[in-house]
Amino acid sequence: IFDFKKIDGAFKYFLNKYKFTVVEGVGGILVPLKQNFFVSDLIKKFNLPVIVVARFGLGTLNHTLLTVEKLKRDRQKILGVILSGKKNKNDISVKSNASIIKKITGLPVLELGYNEKVDLEKNRWIIK
């Protein structure tokens, strides 16, 4: 499905041409791109720093912590976590997930609702 020679060439081109390049994780670090080659392998191959992006709400702790655990096990550079989407203010998990993730992982966590702007001065870790 994927032409990995073209993908390799495109990655090398963009990573060398631009100071800042964003690579979308296409659904998670364990999404297979081909047999026995996952998004996590692509991260390793190009030594990409990672920002874990997760939704607010129930289930986020589990998949975010598993993702961070896998990245740490693979010795990947994790810049932080962004929780994004709709904030249901009546959901206790929405109120507590960011602080729990920060406490357990030691990573910076940014909560970003729909159409909210990011203060890059307060969140410099995003553009390292």
Regions flagged by a language model, labelled:
Residues I1-F37, D41-K44, L58-L65, E69, ...:
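ATP-dependent carboxylate-amine ligase catalytic core
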Residues V68-K128:
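C-terminal lobe/tail of nucleotide-utilizing enzymes
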Residues F46-P49, K77:
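Short glycine-/polar-rich loops that comprise or flank the Walker A/P-loop
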Residues P49-R55, G59:
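A contiguous pocket-lining binding segment that forms or flanks enzyme active sites
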Residues V22-E24, I51-V53, I82:
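Structural motif
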